[in-house]
Amino acid sequence: VPEAGRVNVALCLNIGSSSLKFALFRVTASGEACLASGLVEQLGTPGARAQLKVGANSVERACAGASISAALSVAFRLLEEQSLPRATVVGHRVVHGGREHLTPTAIDRPLLESLRALIPLAPLHLPAAISGMEAALEHWPGLPQIACFDTSFHARMPECAARFPVPAQLFDQGVRRYGFHGLSYEYVLSTLGDPPPRRVIVAHLGNGASLAAIEAGRSVDTTMGFTPGGGILMGTRSGDLDPGLLLYLLRENGYSVDSLEHLLERESGLLGIAGSSDMRQLVERAEHDERAALAIEMMGYQIRKAIGAYVAVLGGLDVLVFTGGIGEHTPSIRR
């Protein structure tokens, strides 16, 4: 937070494997104001497009086949063409910080190398984030750039929730529940008052989905685990499965480790059940398509189970919050 009278302009980047979201904020001691926000969708495809919104105005630009680096260049040009204030700091959402990175951290080469070592823990997310950080460092070599980690919020989770029932040496090596969507959970808490209600459950429901039980501002449990692939079913991710099923697929169905990872991360969840990971499409199809209706029912069922478990963990509930694209825009899931 800047000192009184000082103004920072922060560019916030959320880079995924297929999309780039960005927003420019004026930040003062009294709060922040969004100056512009944008999105580049369908990265790497012929249909890739960039959109920038400044107030009531919107600008679009085609960027067919754009890589993450090229998409960032388009986003930077769009911002510069609108004569917006130049960023004084860049913040990057980073999905996984492992055990080492528990607070926002200045981005430099050693940090990037340490994040590369974590790619096996978040193979869908970290390569894109690292590419984005490298591109932003190249574009603005003298600008402070900060990595903000989704895992930080859950770092003080009680050991009984963080630990898996596997040999102790694995826990000592970092095999534990890390939890994700922490930046979203922190933001939600900041909107609930100071101090926030004591017992809160947040359901962050988007293409990636998780829930968290929060007591007195502290994460006490969350559905995602060692990787962002655990927990409830998601757009293309399976969520939690019987480990015996994975052994069966490896031994009896001819899956390799890589093909099994692809199955669980990119071919499962809503997509595997109903042929689409887009909840909007599934809602439209549900009245006449049994698989679409089943996918919605299964996701809702798993969310209800998680909420019920967390009410028991917290000993009651003061506030239930839905956020994320599905959480905000799909009433049938909230019901």
Residue ranges and their predicted role:
Residues 153-250:
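Glycine-rich phosphate-binding loop of actin/hexokinase-like ATP-binding domains
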Residues 75, 79-125, 144-146, 152-163:
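Short beta-strand-loop/turn "lid" adjacent to the catalytic site in phosphate-handling enzymes
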Residues 318-334:
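Glycine-rich phosphate-binding loops at beta-strand->alpha-helix junctions
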Residues 262, 266-273, 279-313:
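Adenine-nucleotide phosphate-binding core of ATP-dependent small-molecule kinases
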Residues 242-245, 249-275:
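Oxyanion-binding "anion nests"
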Residues 77-88, 192-195, 307-318:
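Phosphate/pyrophosphate-binding loops at sites that engage ATP/ADP/AMP, CoA/4′-phosphopantetheine
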Residues 8-12, 89-91, 146, 200-204:
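Short glycine-aspartate micro-motif
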Residues 6, 15, 19-66, 225:
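Short glycine-rich, Thr/Ser-proximal phosphate-binding strand/loop in the N-terminal lobe
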